[in-house]
């Protein structure tokens, strides 16, 4: 059982990948990447929160008190996340029914159903761990049921806590080594035995950091960006990617909320 707790100390965060094409997202996942499409009656789910592209063309976040207010404005509608970070609902004839309005630099974005009941668009990735690249002998588990695959800014993994996606696991091991199991080669931080009671955290500048019980930095991804909210996604293809900062999110108090556009910020 993953030990995923809210980290109550000051945080800072980051992950970077070139844009790429993605096939239609599978129903039941909790994120949508640039180029992916949520088909009619498709769902993105996280706990009690369910984002549905309804057959009446309305995009609704159930239990999150938000909708696109596009009911009966089209047929066979689909939701797409563009490579400029904009969510777009298109009619079956290809015409645009609704757009989020948040656009930024071209890149690889992620729209995530947040566990607090918001749909959040995170800007281009700033760091990735790809187990298809040589570096560690392949380490494979048996078929592992899908559980938690997200780590947000301010959260930590510790004591064999893990993120899982299909047959892949990212584990913050008790020996202080961060290991991504699965893929052709797997991946590790090579920090075995370098500390005690180590934990992994994602800060608010998009940086992954392993610290020991004295809060000494054992390892970091060494990529950081502007201050904001980031997310580490262990994707179904086994690649762990940090996206952020957030540029748009739904809000129950308003139809939509814009968060600052992505620029090259100073560290």
From Swiss-Prot:
Motif (Carbohydrate-binding motif 2): 173-181
Localization annotation: Secreted
GO cellular component, as recorded: extracellular region
Disulfide partners: 57-77, 176-198
Molecular function in Gene Ontology: D-mannose binding
Primary localization class, coarse: secreted
Family matches, as SUPFAM superfamilies: alpha-D-mannose-specific plant lectins (SSF51110)
Any coiled-coil regions, as ranges: none
BP GO annotations: response to other organism
Domain Bulb-type lectin stretches: 29-134, 148-255
Annotated positions binding beta-D-mannose: 54-58, 62, 66-67, 173-177, 181, 185-188
Statement: the UniProt record of this protein carries the keyword Cell division: no
Superkingdom of origin: Eukaryota
Locus of motif Carbohydrate-binding motif 1: 54-62
Transmembrane regions listed in the UniProt entry: none
Signal peptide coordinates: 1-26
Keywords noted in UniProt: Disulfide bond, Hemagglutinin, Lectin, Mannose-binding, Repeat, Secreted, Signal
Function: Mannose-specific lectin. Shows agglutinating activity towards erythrocytes from rabbit.
Subunit and partners: Forms heterotetramer of 2 chains 1 and 2 chains 2 arranged as a dimer of chain 1 and chain 2 heterodimers.
Name recorded for this polypeptide: Mannose-specific lectin 1
Source species of the chain: Colocasia esculenta (Wild taro)
């Amino acid at each position: 059982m993953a030990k995923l707790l809210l980290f109550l100390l000051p945080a800072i965060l980051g992950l970077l990948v070139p844009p790429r094409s993605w096939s239609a997202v599978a129903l039941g996942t909790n994120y949508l990447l640039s180029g992916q499409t949520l088909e009619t009656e498709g769902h993105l789910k996280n706990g009690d929160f369910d984002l549905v592209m309804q057959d009446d063309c309305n995009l609704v976040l159930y239990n999150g008190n938000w909708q696109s207010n596009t009911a009966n404005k089209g047929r066979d509608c689909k939701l797409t996340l563009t490579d400029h970070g904009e969510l777009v609902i298109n009619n079956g004839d290809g015409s645009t029914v609704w757009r989020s309005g948040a656009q930024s630099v071209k890149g690889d974005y992620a729209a995530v159903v947040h566990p607090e009941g918001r749909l959040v668009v995170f800007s281009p990735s700033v760091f990735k761990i790809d187990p298809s690249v040589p570096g560690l002998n392949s380490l494979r588990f048996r078929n592992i049921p899908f559980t938690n695959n997200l780590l947000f800014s301010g959260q930590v993994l510790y004591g064999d806590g893990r993120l899982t996606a299909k047959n892949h696991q990212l584990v913050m091991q008790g020996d202080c080594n961060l290991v991504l199991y699965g893929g052709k080669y797997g991946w590790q931080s090579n920090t075995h035995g370098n500390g005690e009671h180590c934990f992994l955290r994602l800060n608010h500048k998009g940086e992954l950091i392993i610290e020991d019980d004295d809060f000494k930095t054992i390892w970091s991804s060494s990529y950081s960006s502007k201050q904001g909210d980031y997310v580490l996604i262990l994707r179904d293809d086994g690649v762990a990617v940090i996206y952020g900062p957030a540029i748009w999110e739904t809000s129950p108090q308003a139809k939509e909320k814009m968060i600052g556009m992505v620029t090259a910020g100073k560290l």
